[in-house]
């Protein structure tokens, strides 16, 4: 772990920004885990990444996996000894687990809710309480804060782990009120379809274009079911990019290199499924933000101009605004705040730093490879730590936190690589993971 702390749900927001969005796909690293920014870039450029290639270090997972119980007390089982003495009924408390939150933490969380009555009106609080296992009545009380904290510590422990602070903010809410692509089972179902209709049919599909079209067709089925306009498939100019969403033209870009070759390994297929699903979650996010702005009365032209999306997509959002005061509207508001609202300047700084840190790390790595002196090793260590901190901050952006938590479910549906080509001799080695797993496309990061 890098030691870089994730900001609280109530963390500081910067002043009004210029909008940015997109994603630079990162390489798979140790033990086959993908890591690196799936960022969103400026509306001036594609949401996808392209640029320099570099081996990635193992990236730390940031987050707080807190204890899962406030207090445990068990009664010693009663036993009758052979001597016939009365059973021992002494109550022996076990050592108390570390509390999820102390009194000050509970007070901060209660203040977080009560200071934002427009975000947490009674209707939202009622649904939130029910979602975390409480009686709907009660409003903001200690029980709500502790129940949210407990939910964060258990249900929110998957990477990227949620901070356990009792605040159901823009990172926690999308997981509590799952919808669309992060609904339980949806990602695994998509991954299973990728396995049967793309990976198992690798030789039949034959070309990168055919494989890309089938991939995007499959993920579009999920988007359509969620009420999100489908994307168009296109080749990414960066051939090794395994997926990126360009919201300015509503296109999913996948590089030919990521889908080329006569075979694909399970690792490489899982990376593609994960990345495409992650990017499709960004598609869903951007349409929800458009629907949120529609619910506030913006015209289709206004939505298109503000978000930088096609007018045709904005018209669809305008025709289907989110219900005001609903959990989904509150979730979309959190994403909008991060990308276009009060958090946008902070987001710009985070994306700029992860790009700069990656380039500095690459330069330090090259210097060390050419001259592995103690000084160059120290410089490489420092540059790597800087990149890990920057990546933690990037992954903590609300929209990225959500997408990074959503994508891995698709990878779980991949169970094998493609069948060997029919003309492959017996005992042929499996295909390599491809250059996408060693590449860090960064060019489109702002």
What are these regions (language model features)?
Residues 1-130, 142, 146-153, 158-160, ...:
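Juxtamembrane/interface and other helix-to-disorder boundary residues
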Residues 133-134:
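Glycine- and acidic
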Residues 137-138, 142, 162-166:
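Conserved glycine-centered beta-strand/turn positions repeated across beta-sheet architectures
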């Amino acid at each position: 772990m890098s030691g870089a702390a994730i900001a609280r749900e109530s963390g500081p927001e910067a002043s009004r920004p210029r909008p940015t969005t997109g994603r630079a796909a990162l390489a798979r690293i140790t033990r086959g885990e993908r890591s690196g920014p799936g960022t969103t870039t400026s509306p001036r450029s594609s949401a996808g990444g392209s640029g320099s290639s570099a081996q990635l270090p193992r990236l730390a997972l940031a987050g707080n996996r807190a204890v899962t119980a406030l207090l445990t007390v068990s009664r010693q089982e009663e036993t009758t000894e052979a001597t016939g003495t009365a059973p021992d009924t002494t109550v022996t408390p076990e050592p108390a687990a570390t509390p999820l939150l102390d009194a000050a933490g509970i007070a901060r969380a209660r203040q977080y809710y009560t200071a934002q009555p427009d975000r947490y009106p009674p209707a939202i609080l009622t649904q939130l309480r029910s979602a975390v296992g409480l009686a709907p009545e009660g409003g903001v009380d200690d029980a709500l804060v502790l129940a949210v904290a407990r939910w964060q510590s258990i249900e929110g422990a998957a990477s990227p782990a949620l901070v356990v602070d009792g605040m159901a903010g823009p990172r926690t809410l999308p997981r509590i009120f799952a919808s669309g692509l992060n609904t339980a089972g949806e990602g695994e179902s998509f991954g299973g379809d990728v396995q049967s209709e793309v990976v198992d049919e690798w030789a039949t599909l034959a070309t990168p274009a055919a494989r890309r079209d089938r991939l995007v067709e499959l993920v579009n089925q999920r988007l359509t079911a969620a009420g999100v306009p489908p994307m168009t498939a296109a080749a990414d100019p960066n051939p090794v990019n395994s997926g990126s969403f360009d919201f300015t033209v509503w296109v999913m870009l996948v590089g030919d290199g990521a889908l080329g070759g006569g075979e694909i390994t399970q690792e490489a297929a899982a990376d593609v499924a994960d990345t495409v699903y992650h990017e499709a979650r960004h598609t869903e996010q951007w349409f929800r933000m458009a629907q949120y702005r529609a619910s506030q009365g913006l015209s289709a032209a206004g939505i298109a101009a503000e978000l930088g999306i096609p007018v045709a997509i904005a018209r669809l959002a305008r025709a289907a605004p989110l219900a005001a005061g609903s959990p989904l509207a509150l979730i979309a508001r959190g994403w909008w705040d991060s990308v276009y609202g009060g958090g946008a300047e902070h987001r710009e700084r985070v994306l700029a730093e992860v790009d700069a840190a990656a380039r500095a790390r690459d330069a330090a790595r090259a210097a060390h490879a050419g001259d592995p002196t103690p000084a160059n090793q120290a410089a490489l260590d420092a540059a790597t730590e800087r990149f890990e901190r920057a990546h933690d901050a990037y992954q903590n952006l609300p929209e990225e936190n959500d997408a990074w938590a959503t994508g891995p479910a698709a990878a779980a549906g991949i169970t094998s690589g493609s069948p060997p080509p029919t003309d492959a001799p017996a005992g042929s080695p499996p295909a390599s993971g491809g250059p996408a797993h060693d590449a860090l496309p960064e060019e489109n990061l702002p």
